[in-house]
């Protein structure tokens, strides 16, 4: 029996990340090689012509799984009946802009998109916020879409998670698929804490802790962390454009693991609504280690946290509280 198509919304679809993401979705990388999709693409009126060009290319690519394309500048039309929403559209910070100006632009975008999703998306729609500030945009979306279950609103820290896997893999010259269970704690910003204390590598004699194999705590506690934290800026410097290919790929990873499930014994990082686990204040969207089963994520409990980790986890929580306060001040 062929599966019913899943409707996937991508906002900011004419942008760089959108252009990298929509073919991945249409190829089955996000939801599986046997899952038909209908793509809903939303962008601002200024980008309408470019958006139509992306639609033309999707038609030209003749993707067997792609059963339809909606390309629109109307949020209601874009959100109607969607099962998965990937929120890539946002207002990027430009030179000379204050944080509050950027925040206030994004608060108004996410407030209006929240109400369109709440009124028109399919029940149990899963939402992934990619646009920065991702954690706080997701929090605003949650506030203004109260009927969407809070467990269905997440933000992307899988890009940071994958960057951390990549750094360990390069350092040890092992395939990245042999490295697992790094953790990104906190905000998708330069205060995030990439943690390898629970990470392992598959070797010929079983799984070994990353710390034991790297044998260089100075690197793991220093350069490794700063490289992952600053990787986005390094890519902008090299490419003169922000990371799009890796962001799109990690968005697919995030949704796929959420929908299909994580492999036994593996956890991944997702920005989710805090319930107070690991003494992270409730009411923030914070990146935690999670496992996924039957379309639901669960925070991994009981991992030992050392003092150095605690400090870094608290620091990024503090930044998220400040961002939350700033966002709320834009609302009043």
UniProtKB/Swiss-Prot annotation:
Principal EC category: oxidoreductase
Reaction(s) this enzyme catalyzes, per UniProt: (S)-malate + NAD(+) = oxaloacetate + NADH + H(+)
PROSITE patterns: MDH
Active site: 188
Example GO biological process: malate metabolic process
Keyword Ubl conjugation included in the entry's annotation: yes
Record has Transmembrane helix as a keyword: no
EC number: 1.1.1.37
Residue ranges crossing the lipid bilayer per the database entry: none
Chief localization: cytoplasm
Single GO MF descriptor: L-malate dehydrogenase (NAD+) activity
Per UniProt, location of the Glycyl lysine isopeptide (Lys-Gly) (interchain with G-Cter in ubiquitin) cross-link in this chain: 119
Binding site for NAD(+): 16-17, 43, 90, 113, 132
Tissue specificity note: Expressed in rosette leaves at low levels.
Residues noted as binding oxaloacetate in the record, renumbered to the chain: 99, 132, 163, 188, 243
GO CC list: cytosol; plasma membrane; plasmodesma; plastid
Subcellular location: Cytoplasm
Keywords, comma-separated and alphabetical: Cytoplasm, Isopeptide bond, NAD, Oxidoreductase, Tricarboxylic acid cycle, Ubl conjugation
Pfam families per UniProt: Ldh_1_C, Ldh_1_N
Function description: Catalyzes a reversible NAD-dependent dehydrogenase reaction involved in central metabolism and redox homeostasis between organelle compartments.
Family membership: Belongs to the LDH/MDH superfamily. MDH type 2 family.
Subunit description: Homodimer. Interacts with 14-3-3-like proteins GRF1 GRF3 and GRF8.
UniProt name for this protein: Malate dehydrogenase 2, cytoplasmic
Source organism: Arabidopsis thaliana (Mouse-ear cress)
Gene coding for it: MDH2
């Amino acid at each position: 029996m062929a599966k019913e198509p899943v409707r996937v919304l991508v906002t900011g679809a004419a942008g760089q990340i959108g252009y990298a993401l929509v073919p991945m979705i249409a190829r089955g990388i996000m939801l599986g090689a046997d899952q038909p999709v209908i793509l809903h693409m939303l962008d601002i009126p200024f980008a309408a012509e470019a958006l139509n060009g992306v639609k033309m290319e999707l038609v030209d690519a003749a993707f067997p799984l792609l059963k339809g394309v909606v390309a629109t500048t109307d949020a209601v039309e874009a959100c109607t009946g969607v099962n998965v929403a990937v929120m890539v559209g946002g207002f990027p910070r430009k030179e000379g802009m204050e944080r509050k100006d950027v925040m206030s632009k994004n608060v108004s975008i996410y407030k209006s998109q929240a109400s369109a999703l709440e009124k028109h998306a399919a029940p149990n729609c899963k939402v992934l916020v990619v646009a920065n500030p991702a954690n706080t945009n997701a929090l605003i979306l949650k506030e203004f879409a109260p009927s969407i279950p809070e467990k269905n609103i997440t933000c992307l820290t899988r890009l940071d998670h994958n960057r951390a896997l990549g750094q360990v893999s390069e350092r040890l010259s092992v395939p990245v698929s042999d490295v697992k269970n790094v953790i990104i704690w906190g905000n998708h910003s330069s205060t995030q804490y990439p943690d390898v204390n629970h990470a392992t590598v598959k070797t010929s004699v079983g799984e070994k802790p990353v710390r034991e194999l790297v044998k260089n705590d100075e690197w793991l506690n220093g350069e490794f962390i700063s490289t992952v934290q600053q990787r986005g800026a390094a890519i902008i410097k090299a490419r003169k454009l922000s990371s799009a290919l890796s962001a799109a790929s990690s968005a697919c990873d995030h949704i796929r693991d959420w929908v299909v499930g994580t492999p036994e014994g593996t956890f991944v990082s997702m920005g989710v609504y805090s319930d107070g686990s690991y003494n992270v204040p409730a009411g923030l969207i914070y990146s935690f280690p999670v496992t996924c089963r039957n379309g639901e994520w669960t925070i991994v409990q009981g991992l030992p946290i050392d003092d150095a980790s605690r400090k870094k986890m608290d620091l990024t929580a503090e930044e998220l509280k400040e961002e939350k306060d700033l966002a709320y001040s834009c609302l009043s």
